[in-house]
C-alpha cells in the first residue's frame, strides 16, 4: 500500500515540475527568441517566429 502511495506522489510531483520547465522555454519578448534563431521576427502567444529569407 505504501508503494502505491509513493508512486502517486512521484507522478504528481513530475506532473507539476514538467509544465514549469516547458513554460520557461516559451518567450515573453522577441529578445527571448535569440537563443532559438539568429534573426527573430516576433514572439506571439509564447511562440518564437524567425525571419526567413525570400530565396
From Swiss-Prot:
- Kindly state which keywords UniProt assigns to this record, in alphabetical order: Amidation, Disulfide bond, Ion channel impairing toxin, Neurotoxin, Potassium channel impairing toxin, Pyrrolidone carboxylic acid, Secreted, Signal, Toxin
List cystine links.
27-43, 33-48, 37-50
Residues modified as Threonine amide: 53
Where in the cell is the protein located?
Secreted
Q: Name one GO molecular function term.
A: potassium channel regulator activity
Q: In which tissues is it expressed?
A: Expressed by the venom gland.
Highest taxon, organism lineage: Eukaryota
GO CC aspect terms: extracellular region
Query: Where along the sequence do coiled-coil regions lie?
Result: none
Pyrrolidone carboxylic acid found at: 24
Signal peptide feature range: 1-23
Name the family. Belongs to the short scorpion toxin superfamily. Potassium channel inhibitor family. Alpha-KTx 17 subfamily.
Q: What is known of its domains?
A: Has the structural arrangement of an alpha-helix connected to a beta-sheet by disulfide bonds (CSalpha/beta).
State the protein's purpose.
Blocker of potassium channels, which inhibits both the delayed rectifier and fast transient potassium current. The inhibition is reversible and voltage-independent. It causes a depolarizing shift of the steady-state activation curve of the currents, without changing their steady-state inactivation behavior.
Q: What is this protein called?
A: Potassium channel toxin alpha-KTx 17.1
Q: Where does this protein come from, organism-wise?
A: Olivierus martensii (Manchurian scorpion)
